[in-house]
Structures are given as C-alpha cells and as structure tokens.
Amino acid sequence: MQNNEEPFSKTRSSGQHPSGVHGKKSPRLPKCARCRNHGYASPLKGHKRFCMWRDCQCKKCSLIAERQRVMAAQVALRRQQAQEEELGISHPIPLPIAAELLIKREHGGSSSCLMLESSSTQTTSTSTSGSTTSSEGKMLIQEIPSITSRGHLESTSDLVMDSPYYSNFYQPPLYPYYNNLYNYPPYQMAVATESTSGNDMGGISGPSMKNSHRNHPAAYVPSQSGNQWQMKNGENRFPGHSASSQFRMHSYYPPYLGQSVPNPVCVPPFLTFEEIPSYSEAKASVALSPPSSQDSGIISLSSNSPVSNESTKGAAEQEPNSESSAFTVTTAGEDRE
C-alpha cells in the first residue's frame, strides 16, 4: 500500500511545475488523518471504509475520534435548533439589555408586570449560560411610556401562545346533551300520518300509528313560521285550515337568530300518541265551534267537501271501537275546564 500511495503524492507535486501558469494550482485533496499519523498519505475520498487504522486506539487516533464525536454533537444541536425555529417553538428573543428580572410599569398603572427570562423551559443550556452569568442577581426597572412604544417586545408576542384565549375553544358545552349550535330539542313528532281515505284516520291508534309514522317521516315539513306542520303531498285537502292549539305541532328546527329564539323551557309538552283523540271525538268537539272560526283541527274537514260525507259514515261505525279502547281520551274542551 505504501508503494501505491507514495507515487501519488510525487506525481501530484511534480505535476504542479510543468503547468505554464504558476498562480493556478490544483485543489488540495483531503487525506486520511489516521493514515497520516502512521506515515501514509492516502486520499480520503472512498477510503474511510477501507482504512487500516479506523479502529486504532493509539494516542493520536483517539484524539481524532474525540474530535469527531464533538463535531457530531454540534451538528445535531444546530439541526435541532433549526427545527425548533421552523416550528415556532424557539425561546423568546433576548432583550438588548440582558436582565434576569424585568419590571415594566405603564403610564398611570399601579400594577407592574414581571417577566422572568429564566422561567422558559424551552431555552437551551448553551444559549442561556452566557446571559445568566453576566446578569445574575441584577434587577432592572424600566419606565415604558405606552404600549405602542415597546419596539422589540412586539416580536416576542408572536412566539408566545396565549393559553386562556385558546382554551376557550375547547371548553365543554353548557348542555352536554345537545352538541350542536342551536341546542335543538330531540326529534319528537306526534302528528298522525295521512291515509288514503278519510274513514281510515279514526282507526289508527297506539303502536300501529307509531309504526306507520316511522315509515312516512318526510310527509310533513315545517312551515315558514316554524310553529306548525304542513302537508307536503300534492293533494292538500285542508288549504284554508290551520292547526288548533290541541293538534299544533312545534317544528324541529327553531327560527334563525334574526327572529326570536325559542326557549326550550317554555315549549309546551309534546302530545303522545295515546293522548291524541280519535277522529270521531275530534269531529264532535269541532262541530261545537262556530263555522267562521279558523281554529279547526288538522283532522277536521269542511262541510262542503265530498270527503266529509263519507267520513261521517265511517265515524259513526267506529264510535263503539273508540269507546272500548284501552286508553282514555280527553277533548280540548275538557282540558280547558
């Protein structure tokens, strides 16, 4: 190996003079330090894996190994600091006048703000060692005229996160049952589904009404006022009638913030399926009201419609069935008494 490496150095030294220009020299090639310590000159490029003294423990080679460890630690430290600066979590920018404790007093303000620079846990030991030794045990009192004249202090506020401000976004809601913006009530609907003929409406009761209502949830949509339900189908049999207070249904979606927001406490209780009277008793209670009133029920029909003649016959046949039902029914007049 000595024969191959020595001529390389000779040809390199001899090749400098034949060149006509003395000012320009070929760049110096790096050599292996371990081989140089043992008297050999070998180029470093591609030689590290094949060096004969890479595991040598002599005094000179041990110094080389120690220097390599120190340089590797410095490179790793610089790389970590660069990553922290990119992520924005580096330590605050030190003030021009290094002070361990800074007391700031505003104009006419009795309270003073204390800033302890050594309380930052993200500062590295190398960056804080110089400032702590030079300013240890010193206190500086600085009068600041106004907030706008802080200068360099404004740049430090960008790096410090205001924890009370950001913690407001993650507070649990006041009503854990409702997890939306408007605190909607649970979806409950106590409106009888529409049947094909008028005489079928009196026969629906109890569980059958619940099952049929689940199959047709989209037959009713909230009106523009948001206080009652209207039919969505094309055959709207009751265009001029509005729902009475007994059959009036509150919509699922409350009005927007521009209107008056309903309070869930003040909403009247929803009617269950057992509390809805049958068609025949509702017909009898509505017949007592004057014909000019607009407060007739959803299930009631006008006297001029041809469907009412057919429905009255079916209601007369189903009166005994409604009286023998398991649950009790109260009309609107009895509730008011």
Curated annotation (Swiss-Prot):
Its cellular-component GO annotations read: nucleus
Q: Where is this region: Disordered?
A: 1-28, 113-136, 287-337
Q: Which residues form a coiled coil?
A: none
Q: Which Gene3D superfamilies match?
A: DM DNA-binding domain
Superkingdom of origin: Eukaryota
Q: Which GO terms describe its biological process?
A: cell differentiation; male gonad development; positive regulation of DNA-templated transcription
**Known InterPro entries for this protein?**
DM_DNA-bd (IPR001275), DM_DNA-bd_sf (IPR036407), DMRT (IPR026607), DMRT1-like (IPR022114)
- Bias class Polar residues marks the residues at 1-17, 319-331
* Localization, UniProt: Nucleus
- The residues that cross the membrane are none
Quote the biased-composition stretches of kind Low complexity, using this chain's numbering.
Answer: 113-135, 292-311
Q: Which residues bind DNA?
A: 32-79
Any GO MF annotation of the entry: sequence-specific DNA binding
**Which UniProt keywords are listed?**
Activator, Developmental protein, Differentiation, DNA-binding, Metal-binding, Nucleus, Repressor, Sexual differentiation, Transcription, Transcription regulation, Zinc
Q: What does this protein do?
A: Transcription factor that plays a key role in male sex determination and differentiation by controlling testis development and germ cell proliferation. Acts both as a transcription repressor and activator.
Classification via PANTHER family: DOUBLESEX AND MAB-3 RELATED TRANSCRIPTION FACTOR DMRT, DOUBLESEX- AND MAB-3-RELATED TRANSCRIPTION FACTOR 1
User: Can you tell me which family this protein belongs to?
Assistant: Belongs to the DMRT family.
The identity of this protein, by name, is Doublesex- and mab-3-related transcription factor 1
* Native source species: Xenopus tropicalis
State the gene name recorded for this protein. dmrt1
